[in-house]
Amino acid sequence: MDITDRFADLVRGPEDECRIDLGAFLIAAHANRGLDVDDQLHRLDDLAMGCPTPTLDGVCEHLFGVVGFQGDTEDYKHPRNSLLDVVLDRRRGIPITLAVVVMEVGRRLGLDLAGVGMPGHFLVRDRDRIAATAMRAKLN
């Protein structure tokens, strides 16, 4: 199936079935027509398998502390920072692509993570932890 058709099918489907990792790699495949999207998805699987602690903090420690992912402070606006395959290769990216890596590694570990858009930033939150905190606040 054509990359554009595959992307269109993905975003037309139910929201809860719209996988961010697949969408990001399909976008990257437009820049690199030889990109094997399924191979790229397996790279995220491998990152998840290497994570010893299945928590948001554990994923962040693994990706940023052990594997060496970091923000690209030298050439922040370069388009390669928006291509998930290149971010995996370089272990450098912008907040939104790094957040996609965190969320998708977390999803593979059974975590319920979500992206949070902020002015000039993109953050990741653990839905379970926030829900538990909100419940405690209501009970106290």
For the regions a protein language model found, what residue spans apply to each?
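A structural boundary/capping signal
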Residues: 1-140
